[in-house]
Amino acid sequence: MLNIAVDLLWLRPKKVGGTEFYIRNLLDGFLQLEEPFRLWLLVSKDNKETFRHYTQDKRIELLETEVVSANIAGRILWNFFCQNRFLRKKGIRKCFIPVYCRPLFNGGIAYVNVIHDLQAAHYPEYHPFHEIAYSRLCWWLDAHFSRHLVAISDWVRNDVKEKYHVKSGKITTIYNPITVDKEELVSFEQLAEKYHVAENEFYYTVAQLIPHKNLHTLIAVMERIKNTDVGLPCRLLISGVNGESRDKLESQIRNRGLEREVTLTGFVENAERNALYKYCRAFLFSSVFEGFGMPPIEAMLFGTTVIATDRACVPEVTQGKANYVKDPYDVEEWIRVMQNPADRIAEMDFAQYDQMKLTRKYFELLRKYLE
């Protein structure tokens, strides 16, 4: 029987973007499995209550630590030097870590890690030196000491194989499970009152406010629409957890006189996000680097036109069925694509992101390498 720890100490609720949705979707999938298993969720003082409800299933228990996830440096040190001993004392010898971070040594514990991307390797200019050093160390440890690796797209798998010389048999691609409840919606009247938008007369995007999401280009697109007669709605809503670019984006919005046209909504709950997906003219995905990219697929599940960059994994995970901008920084190209988007959503195979299909892939992989 599968009997493993699941390291969740890295998760700072509503602070880590898509990785939080990924692991919660996966854990929700485990609840629906009929097979026997035992998951010990390794949780921190400041995230444990967000996982408490999983213990209603007798197959899942919390392993509470003294770690504070918000104290990133403290969490890393505990992860490096204390985690193995903690697990051994609990009689646990196998651990699944759904991100790249891990202890310095195995210490008698078998680990399976998930690598979501190698962002700091591709865009070091967006990260301080200590983040780059830590990321590269963990990726090297994953490649050399973890029993097996999961990549969240073929693009990431190939990237890891190339940069860390990982053999094909040691890394498996499993897409992120995507769950969208199409009935979980606030009314459009609520959106209209809150954001002063008209149905099908605004654009929407979901992205963490960090540089490689390329949101400054979308703001420039809105400025061009406002100042020229291109026949497009001049209204953009941007949802996502705060990041280092928030101040710069707010300044850009003010300096261009777009306070009425561009709104940073901050984090929004699923019901509001879903309604924004459904009622927008199109979903714009300007990111230049992604390991997977869940928001475009979520938008397409609502039948919404998606306009995205063709960088990294985005064409792969959208199955080539979105509308693509070849130069993600070219304002004029964005406008041209926005003026004449194609609708190929009916050709999408959404079963590739099915929660239970992918949960079962994880279950079988973890049984193979950790049972």
Which positions does each model-derived feature cover?
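Carbohydrate transferase catalytic cores enriched for Leloir-type hexosyltransferases
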Residues: 1-371
